[in-house]
């Protein structure tokens, strides 16, 4: 009888109920909210579902992220090994390859001035960097946090890992992906407030056709130029352009399909669940997390505003040929930010089609955010 009671007692002690803290319950509730937003509201489900599920798992069973050195048998938790690929910057780089294989840089090639709008939208990153330092973060932490302003989750994870700021990786990644999902909510008020009705109704000239040769040369030239100037961007820009070269060369269809689909989605699963698993209650429920979330919002809002303001400048310089609404697409949330530009413009003139014009700054923003990350790495001597 004692054996049975002891066995039952041990079984009960091993259940998660006996080890749950109030903080764990809060994070489980947050995971449920993310799942609701992803499944019911359709907010970036490919990202939020794995992130939310990783968050759920780690707060029910923390040892799923156990490091091997802390394990009795020397074997770590499952998601720890996924997370190691984040720390080594492997998964973010592979995500960029997949994005490159899915992306058409034609609108950017047809209108190179879009590069300027993509660059302007990176202002939010540098503004957030100095604000973060003012709030008490060290320079490397400030740099890792500020990249959230580009609305680019993989780059945020990449830079946090490279700068050794893994303690902030969970909040940074969750904030970055959350703001990517909330682009349709955050950007429109800024776009509407800082542009006139007349500017919103500006119709832009149709983009010129882009030849296949131009599309093939573009990833090669960008890789050579950017990586010669900032070699630290090679893992991101190099993989982005390699994926795009797969797509545009037309001779490696199997590689294109694999990079854009099978590999991309496998990496999203690994990246999402491992990022979610960094949000244990002990690591996430801190005042620092609130600061990071606030800084991310400031950075993203500043980036959107800078893009719109520079769009207004280009509108004046070109004699009203540029609709300032496409400036907000300079953040690297592809293609959500471009769709928002189209949606806001259509509210004022249903016959105004800005999507392809907005895609230029949007894809330029992907390159711009990677360059910003590479700049920080160069400043801190990280290779």
Regions found by a protein language model. Name each.
Residues 107-129, 280-307, 358-362:
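Entry/N-cap segments of selected transmembrane alpha helices
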Residues 167-185, 295-303, 326-329:
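Alpha-helical transmembrane segments
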Residues 88, 96-103, 117-127, 131, ...:
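Alpha-helical membrane segments and immediately flanking helix-loop junctions
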Residues 1-74:
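N-terminal alpha-helical transmembrane segments of multi-pass membrane transport
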Residues 1-19, 25, 75, 189-218, ...:
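Intrinsically disordered, low-complexity non-transmembrane regions of multi-pass membrane transporters
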Residues 34, 57, 85-109, 243-246, ...:
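Hydrophobic transmembrane alpha-helices of secondary-active transporters
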Residues 175-251:
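Membrane-embedded hairpin module used as a gating/binding unit in multi-pass transport
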Residues 223-307:
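Transmembrane helical segments that form the transport core of multi-pass membrane transport proteins
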